[in-house]
Amino acid sequence: MVIIHGAGSRKENHGDFGRACAAAGWAALAYDQRGHGASEEEMGPAALGDLGRMARFVGSIDDVDPDRVCVRGSSMGGFVAIHGAATSDAIRAVVAICPAGEQHLLQGLRSGSLEMRAGPQARAALEAWLGEHDLRQAVELLGAKPLLLIHARGDERIASEWSEELYRHAAEPRKLIVLPGGHHHSAQHDAELQGLSLRWLERTISN
């Protein structure tokens, strides 16, 4: 399992899911996206390639089946997870929690509310790259790769209707969970949902 955080976050914030993976017998890797945490790089379009490399690395670990490497991304991490899975054969399935669309990321980038380290050139490159991508199309490109979408109805940053729209673009196997209430960060740290995610992945990637 490759775990991808959102904007303004870092890998340590998802340690609870990493521990849940380990307890369920999954190898798990969380990393700092560019422009975050201990990463020395500025955030930019190369972030997508980083995910593919991380997935291949996890698949190369002893006792890890390279055909069962999955990704879980939250918010901006959900955007990267879906696009990464749509373009990399190293990724088998996706869990996206309150995934941000390119429109949400562009709005945050232009308003300055998107927390990340990126200078003017990096921000310009990121804005141009986001303008060329559509998360709905990426969902369609997943084809038969399993997609689990989780969203809190009370999300104050990204409306849950966005995940409902993405779900309509997804092929089977797919699953959408919309939680009553909550907020932008509540679903990613819910222990029950973490267990449900892993069980759903086990069932779908074993078929």
Residue spans for each PLM region:
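Conserved alpha/beta-hydrolase "acid-adjacent" motif
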Residues: 156-162
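The serine-hydrolase catalytic nucleophile loop
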Residues: 7-19, 33, 41, 161
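Short beta-strand element of the alpha/beta-hydrolase
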Residues: 1-6
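Hydrolase active-site cap/lid region
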Residues: 83-128, 186
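Short beta-strand/loop motif that positions the catalytic acidic residue
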Residues: 142-143, 149-151, 155
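Alpha/beta-hydrolase fold nucleophile elbow
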Residues: 63-75
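Alpha/beta-hydrolase active-site loop
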Residues: 13, 42-62
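Catalytic histidine-centered segment of alpha/beta-hydrolase-like enzymes
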Residues: 182-192
